[in-house]
Regions:
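N-terminal auxiliary segments of SAM/dcSAM-dependent transferases
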Residues: 1-30
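SAM-dependent methyltransferase
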Residues: 7, 15-20, 155-215
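Conserved alpha-helix/loop element of class I SAM-dependent methyltransferases that forms part
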Residues: 44-67
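Conserved SAM/SAH-binding loop
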Residues: 75
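Conserved SAM/SAH-binding beta-strand->alpha-helix loop
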Residues: 95-96
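Conserved SAM-binding strand-loop segment of SAM-dependent methyltransferases
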Residues: 106-117
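A short SAM/SAH-binding and catalytic strip from SAM-dependent methyltransferases
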Residues: 124-144
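A short glycine-rich, Lys/Arg-flanked "PGG" loop and its adjoining helix->strand segment in the class I
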Residues: 143-156
Length: 244
């Protein structure tokens, strides 16, 4: 697994976040993939407030307790809301530009760090991974590595709150059946590359995990997984705890 942070020259999302923070607007943050048509991420969405968050994210922030770690914190929308609720939160991200913006926006404890970096240590009661938190595993084969790493950072009575989506809807035919190649790669594995203005990021793997698969992998890792909120479009929020 990658353990380092991004260089500013290869941080398109961070550059877009910085522009929006400084000027209230940003150019197109393009999302490329070998599997889908080109898409665009609305940068304003990264600055959303509680009322504009999907119910899965709202529920995660409501459920968070104790010493909270927000992984992949982006522009800091979740960390800021937790602070407003009076909760203690540490925000980490691999984007130095995003981390600077979070500090300027008032997030009190920010560190530019990759969660897989061995020098990152701590014990947290709640670990948040939102906006498709399983994504950072990249591949299904790496999901146990992610979960085991989170176990190291979780207090004995702690919890992981992570969201994802089941991409099976992409393979649904007109009759409502799902045309998925069970002999091919796991259907939730995708690749992305982000481009902002003249800044092109490195291609990266991203993992969407269906609830049944997430529960099975959690069980392999000595963890219990419970789906506590379901969204409108195959998205969900899971609560993961240590198996007693």
């Amino acid at each position: 697994m990658q353990t380092d942070t991004l260089s500013i020259s290869q941080d398109p999302m961070g550059a877009a976040i910085r522009d929006f923070h400084l000027t209230g607007k940003a150019g197109r943050l393009r999302v490329l993939s070998s599997m889908f048509e080109e898409d665009e991420m609305p940068v304003a969405h990264l600055f959303r407030t509680f009322k504009d968050m999907p119910r899965t994210e709202q529920r995660a922030l409501e459920e968070a307790y104790g010493n909270v770690l927000d992984i992949g914190a982006g522009a800091g929308c979740h960390a800021l809301e937790l602070q407003q609720q009076g909760k203690s939160v540490k925000a980490i991200d691999i984007s130095p530009l995003s981390c600077e913006v979070m500090k300027e926006r008032g997030v009190k404890d920010v560190e530019c760090k990759n969660v897989f970096c061995p020098t990152f240590i701590g014990q947290f009661d709640t670990i948040l991974l939102l906006m498709n938190g399983t994504g950072i595993a990249g591949k299904l084969s790496n999901l146990p590595n992610l979960l085991n790493r989170l176990k190291q950072l979780m207090s004995k009575d702690g919890q992981i709150l992570i969201d994802s989506s089941d991409l099976k809807y992409i393979y649904e035919d007109e009759d409502g059946a799902f045309d998925i190649d069970l002999n091919g790669p796991y259907y939730g594995e995708v690749d992305y590359q982000m481009v902002y203005r003249n800044i092109k990021g490195e291609p990266f793997d991203w993992l969407y995990t269906d609830p049944t698969m997430l529960k099975a992998v959690c069980e392999q890792c000595g963890l219990k997984c419970e789906i506590i909120e379901e969204g409108d479009h195959y998205d969900y929020l899971a609560k993961i705890t240590l198996t007693i």
